[in-house]
Structures are given as structure tokens and as C-alpha cells.
């Protein structure tokens, strides 16, 4: 995008903003900075937003991705995708949105698609940069592994993937066991820990070592130590959730 062009500022109506918990503009700007500083995002890259919601990340990307860059996003929230198509794609024709009818007990209880079998609607090795913000924090193990497999499939060689998690490690375990964590991941289901055993997808945490092993299984390597979040009560943090940056290694 030309520097002299007017910056685009879009904010969805309040009833849609509630879907992502508010703070639409602030969180979008925060993660735009992380994508550049942590993810090394370039303005001419092809980007995939898994779980794009109501465009909270797409809106700031409108002012960063050039005409040589391309954005794709998909989500299970119909109204969010409709708003994005009507307000974002009409301004930037290199921004593409797709609705997917994936079942989620909390967000889409009537969905017809199984998240653990859903094939991303893109060709192999299509993307330079993929990001998932507050997506793996809602997926159970079978679903999560399938998504990692699909990410590895559609990511270009040497492409990067930026993911947020709730990671269980010695430090976060200390806060959890001491009752200091605002989020209580005390219910274990398979290889994960959930906040609400009756609605497990509401919030899901994973052992950091298990995530590292899973990523490596599909040829994704963590590029830096995780950037830990404040969710468990730690005082030194980057964001709210934990951030991991992975890269698809050329030779496995």
C-alpha cells in the first residue's frame, strides 16, 4: 500500500465486536506489531488467518500488506465473514474471506464439519505466513493435531506460523498449583487441560513439551523460545496468551 494513501480504519458494530471479547482496535494493533517483530512478516507475503473472526487482525493488515501481498481468512462465524466481505474485501480486492461450517461446542454448536477432519481450502505450499490467535486455545488434541498437519501442508518451505497457546510448563504450573492463576486449568482430558469440563472447547491448555513434539512431528521448528503471556499470573510477559513462532524446515 502506498505510504501516501489514507489509512483505513474499520470497526465492526458492537454486537459483532462482543464475539471476540472487545478491544477490537487495540488488540489488532498489538498483534500487528507482533507479526512484524516476532513473525518477521513482510508486506508482500501471502498470509493465512486461521479463525479470522470479525477481521480484528485483517483490518490492521489492510494498512500493511501491499498490492503484491495477499490475505486469506476463514472462520465459522457467519456474520463475521459477511461483515469482512462487505467491508474489507470491497476496499482491498487482495483480501479474501471464507465461511466454514466447523462444529464447535461453544462457538458453533450446529456446525456440520468435524474440525479433526476439515481440509483447509487451499493448495499445498500456498502461504508464506500463517497465524492463529486464540484458536488452539479452543481445540482438543485430535483437532489440534489435524490443524497442525494442515498448516504444514499449506505452508511454503521456510514459511512461518505464529500461534497463541495456553502453555503448561514449570512456571505456569507453579502459578496454577499456588492458586495464583486467573485461569484454572485443573481438568485433564486426554493430553490437555480445560477450564470447563462441561464445555471443554471453552479454553484449552497444553504441556509446552507436547506442543514442541507435535510441531516437530510435522516438520515445524520453533524459531525462538516462546513469548510467554500473563494468563497464568506471571508478571513478566509479552501478551495475554503465550506466543510460539514456528518455521517449516526445508528438509525433514
Where are the regions a protein language model picked out?
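Helix-to-beta-strand junctions that scaffold the AdoMet/dcAdoMet cofactor pocket
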Residues: 66, 139-140, 155-156
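A short glycine-rich, Lys/Arg-flanked "PGG" loop and its adjoining helix->strand segment in the class I
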Residues: 145-157
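Conserved acidic residues
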Residues: 128
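Conserved class I S-adenosyl-L-methionine
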Residues: 44-53
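A conserved beta-strand element that flanks and buttresses the S-adenosyl-L-methionine
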Residues: 131
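Short catalytic micro-motifs in class I SAM-dependent methyltransferases
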Residues: 134-135
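Class I (Rossmann-like) S-adenosyl-L-methionine-dependent methyltransferase catalytic domain
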Residues: 1-38, 54-61, 70-119, 160-252
Amino acid at each position: 500500500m502506498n505510504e501516501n494513501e489514507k489509512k483505513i480504519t474499520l470497526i465492526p458494530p458492537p454486537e459483532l465486536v462482543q464475539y471476540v471479547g472487545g478491544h477490537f482496535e487495540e488488540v489488532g494493533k498489538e498483534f500487528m506489531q507482533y507479526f512484524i517483530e516476532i513473525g518477521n512478516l513482510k508486506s508482500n507475503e501471502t498470509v493465512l488467518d486461521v479463525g479470522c473472526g470479525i477481521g480484528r487482525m485483517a483490518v490492521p493488515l489492510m494498512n500493511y500488506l501491499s498490492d503484491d501481498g495477499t490475505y486469506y481468512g476463514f472462520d465459522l462465524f457467519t456474520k463475521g465473514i459477511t461483515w469482512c466481505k462487505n467491508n474489507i474485501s470491497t476496499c482491498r480486492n487482495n483480501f479474501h474471506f471464507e465461511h466454514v461450517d466447523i462444529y464447535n461446542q461453544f462457538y458453533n454448536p450446529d456446525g456440520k464439519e468435524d474440525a479433526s477432519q476439515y481440509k483447509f481450502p487451499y493448495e499445498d505450499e500456498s502461504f508464506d505466513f500463517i497465524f492463529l490467535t486464540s484458536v488452539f486455545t479452543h481445540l482438543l488434541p485430535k483437532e489440534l493435531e489435524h490443524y497442525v498437519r494442515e498448516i504444514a501442508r499449506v505452508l511454503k518451505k521456510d514459511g512461518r506460523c505464529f500461534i497463541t497457546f495456553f502453555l503448561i510448563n514449570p512456571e505456569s504450573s507453579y502459578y496454577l498449583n499456588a492458586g495464583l492463576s486467573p485461569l484454572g486449568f485443573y481438568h485433564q482430558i486426554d493430553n490437555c487441560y480445560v477450564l470447563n469440563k462441561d464445555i471443554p472447547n471453552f479454553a484449552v491448555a497444553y504441556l509446552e513439551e507436547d506442543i514442541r513434539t507435535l510441531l516437530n512431528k510435522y516438520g515445524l521448528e520453533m524459531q525462538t523460545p516462546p513469548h510467554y503471556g500473563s494468563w497464568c499470573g506471571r508478571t513478566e510477559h509479552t501478551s495475554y496468551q503465550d506466543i510460539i513462532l514456528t518455521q517449516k524446515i526445508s528438509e525433514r
